[in-house]
């Protein structure tokens, strides 16, 4: 089903796109590139019917289809039920050791909207952004579809401080649910984790709101 999402509303922070452009230029040149994802259960692919239908794999597939001359490797470092506090502790082993060139970070429904988690999220973002490969980083804010809650207010401060692009489901998909144009059970069985249709929708916001 095609949904009429206002993708322009999904830009939580425009940020500097210089690194993203550099990765795309390298892809056009046919280089080998690592496309990586770090987050919680949604990134892991929870409730997608198979791993290839989670939002992260959809984004990876977009890179492959858009730049067929390049050699891409998919790195999914999502672990369900984890926050950015655990994310920063495992970032080196699970993500940075694999030398990513493009990274999506997704913890806005795992972290609470508190100063503590703003600090742990900032530590994670800084660790990834300043790592050896200097990857392009995209911050993704998922949302609870029953009440619109997430940690975007706190996480958004970090996006602005580091001038990083960030996209939001709170301002794209959630308003459509509230308005009744999308039935929540069409995209999520539990008001949080997307089903296959929901994962595809999240991936479309990731791509089109950047």
Model-derived regions, located:
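Structural cue for short, hydrophobic secondary-structure segments
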Residues: 37-38, 106
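Short hydrophobic segments within beta-strands
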Residues: 38-39, 140
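N-terminal secretory targeting modules
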Residues: 1-37, 43-50, 61-70, 194-209
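Alpha-helical cap/lid subdomain in secreted, periplasmic
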Residues: 31, 54-75, 80-82, 86-208
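A short, flexible beta-alpha/helix-coil linker loop
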Residues: 41-44, 109-111
């Amino acid at each position: 089903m095609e949904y009429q999402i206002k993708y322009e509303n999904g830009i939580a922070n425009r940020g500097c796109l210089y690194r993203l452009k550099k990765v795309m230029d390298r892809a056009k040149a046919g280089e080998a590139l690592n496309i990586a994802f770090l987050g919680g259960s949604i990134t892991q692919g929870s409730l997608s019917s198979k791993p290839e239908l989670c939002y992260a794999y959809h984004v990876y597939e977009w890179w492959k289809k858009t730049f067929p001359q390049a050699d891409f490797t998919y790195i999914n470092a999502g672990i369900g039920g984890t926050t950015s506090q655990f994310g920063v502790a495992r970032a080196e082993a699970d993500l940075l050791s694999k030398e990513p060139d493009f990274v999506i970070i997704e913890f806005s429904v795992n972290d609470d909207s508190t100063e503590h988690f703003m600090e742990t999220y900032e530590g994670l973002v800084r660790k990834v952004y300043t790592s050896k490969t200097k990857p392009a980083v995209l911050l993704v804010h998922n949302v609870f579809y029953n009440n619109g809650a997430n940690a975007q207010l706190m996480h958004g401060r970090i996006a602005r401080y580091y001038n990083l692009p960030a996209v939001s489901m709170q301002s794209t998909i959630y308003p459509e649910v509230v308005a009744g144009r999308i039935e929540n059970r069409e995209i999520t069985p539990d008001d949080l984790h997307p089903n296959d249709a929901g994962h595809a929708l999240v991936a479309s916001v990731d791509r089109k709101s950047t």
